[in-house]
UniProtKB/Swiss-Prot annotation:
This is Transcription antitermination protein NusB. It comes from Limosilactobacillus fermentum (strain NBRC 3956 / LMG 18251). One of its GO terms (molecular function) is RNA binding. Belongs to the NusB family. Pfam families: NusB. GO terms for biological process: DNA-templated transcription termination; transcription antitermination. Keywords: RNA-binding, Transcription, Transcription antitermination, Transcription regulation. The lineage of its organism: Bacteria, Bacillati, Bacillota, Bacilli, Lactobacillales. InterPro entries: NusB-like_sf, NusB_fam, NusB_RsmB_TIM44.
Length: 139
């Protein structure tokens, strides 16, 4: 079965959220619970790329996010779902060549509709708009 990237992003969000609560969570088991995979079917490569990429670049992304927050705000004040959405968007903005920055931002805003609220949408749009620079080449 082929999954649309939007669905893969949602599963990546859910996986990363679970990993915040339990860093030892079994990712493969989570994928099986969140995606209707046939027994022989493999986890979509893009899902693995997102989850691994966000995890590997988390410190870099958190530093960028913190630098974009209003005076007096720290990363600890950002709600966990919003932080994960920001990290996912930053990964796509900086490391996924075939996802334009505008698309990464739009997809983050769509995810916010599903996993957060309207106030958070404005916050995420502001942070990503502030950061939205050129992509970094992948290793």
């Amino acid at each position: 079965m082929t999954f649309k990237r939007r669905r893969i992003r949602e599963v990546a969000f859910q996986t990363l959220f679970a990993m915040v609560s339990d860093p030892e969570v079994d990712r493969e088991q989570l994928y099986k619970e969140l995606l209707p995979l046939a027994p022989q079917e493999e986890v979509p490569a893009y899902l693995e790329e997102l989850v691994t990429g966000v995890s590997e670049h988390q410190a870099e992304f958190d530093q960028e996010i913190e630098g974009s927050l209003a005076a007096g705000w720290s990363l600890s004040r950002v709600e966990k779902p919003n932080l994960i959405i920001l990290r996912l968007a930053l990964y796509e903005m900086k490391y996924v060549d075939d996802v334009p920055v505008a698309v990464a931002i739009d997809e983050a805003l769509e995810m916010t509709k599903k996993f957060s609220d309207d106030k958070s949408r404005k916050f995420i749009n502001g942070v990503l708009g502030h950061i939205g620079g050129p992509k970094t080449t992948s290793n």
